[in-house]
UniProtKB/Swiss-Prot annotation:
PANTHER family to which the protein is assigned, alphabetical: IMIDAZOLE GLYCEROL PHOSPHATE SYNTHASE HISHF, IMIDAZOLE GLYCEROL PHOSPHATE SYNTHASE SUBUNIT HISF/H IGP SYNTHASE SUBUNIT HISF/H
Protein name in the entry: Imidazole glycerol phosphate synthase subunit HisF
InterPro entries given in the database record: Aldolase_TIM, His_biosynth, HisF, IGPS_HisA/HisF, RibuloseP-bd_barrel
Enzyme Commission number: 4.3.2.10
Length: 270
């Protein structure tokens, strides 16, 4: 059995970590590097950094903080934001990131997934998907440019179809951001995640909705995701990562021990 991952998410805007509700009304949480170091020491298995306005501002992620993070943490981290070319990705990986994630740029140029896979390997390529449940049509729809309220727009893709497409092009991991649940702390969208799990053959990370420890237990046990990403519950001290992992372990969810990059769960592979 593979060990599951707990992944704090740090949304970055103008050099600060911020957090909104359903991708709106962002408040400043703090500085990037100290927060990264804090989470690494607190027992996080991995970190994800989203420069949330990079794509909508037509720029690549601000790389000035990437190398500083690599110097102070000993766990893997992923960086996202406006990565539109293999050169953009290469510079971020050279600065110490373990993975790069693309979202809107992949929707605009799906061939980019193939290119990144061929140059850097599948293990480096994460696809972020912002999925919105449309009650009127009873469909899950993929949105882009969600970091900028004024530019957010629906793409041509339905979520399940886009999952299949990115896998066929070489995605190594998928982060499903459930927009309806984002920041409201009422639980992950287990129904949608189960539907995605049925077609997703690569590691699947749940994002959006964590509010209490039971929500993590539910998403791991019911949707069989490989990792759970959360922001506000960690930023605001609502959930302690060590306590979360202890509770998950007691509920039969395999978790990694706190040994940085060599972390392993008892009796399982990392």
């Amino acid at each position: 059995m593979l060990a599951k991952r707990i992944i704090p998410c740090l949304d970055v805007r103008d050099g600060k970590v911020v957090k909104g509700v359903q991708f709106r009304n962002h408040e400043i949480i703090g500085d990037i590097v100290p927060l990264a170091e804090q989470y690494a020491k607190a027992g996080a298995d991995e970190l994800v950094f989203y420069d949330i306005t990079a794509s909508s501002d037509a720029r690549v992620v601000d790389k000035s903080w990437v190398s500083r993070i690599a110097q102070v943490i000993d766990i893997p981290f992923c960086v996202a934001g406006g990565i539109k070319s293999i050169e953009d990705a290469g510079r971020i990986l050279e600065m110490g990131a373990d993975k790069i994630s693309i979202n809107s740029p992949a929707l605009n140029n799906p061939e980019l997934i193939n290119q990144l896979h061929d140059v850097y390997g599948q293990q480096c390529v994460v696809i972020g998907i912002d999925s919105f449940y449309n009650e009127a049509t009873d469909q899950y729809e993929v949105y882009k440019f969600t970091g900028d309220e004024a530019r957010t727009q629906k793409s041509q893709w339905q979520t399940i179809d886009w999952i299949k497409e990115v896998q066929s092009r070489g995605a190594g991991e998928i982060v499903l951001n459930c927009m309806n649940q984002d920041g409201v702390r009422k639980g992950y969208d287990v129904k949608q995640l189960k539907a995605v799990r049925d077609v997703c053959e690569v590691p699947l990370i749940a994002s959006g909705g964590a509010g209490e420890i039971a929500h993590f237990t539910d998403v791991f046990q019911q949707a069989d995701v490989d990792g759970a990403l959360a922001a506000s519950v960690f930023h605001k001290g609502i959930i302690n990562i060590d306590e979360l992992k202890a509770e998950l372990t007691s509920n039969g969810v395999a978790m990694r021990k706190r040994h940085g990059l060599t972390a392993q769960a008892e009796g399982v592979n990392p």
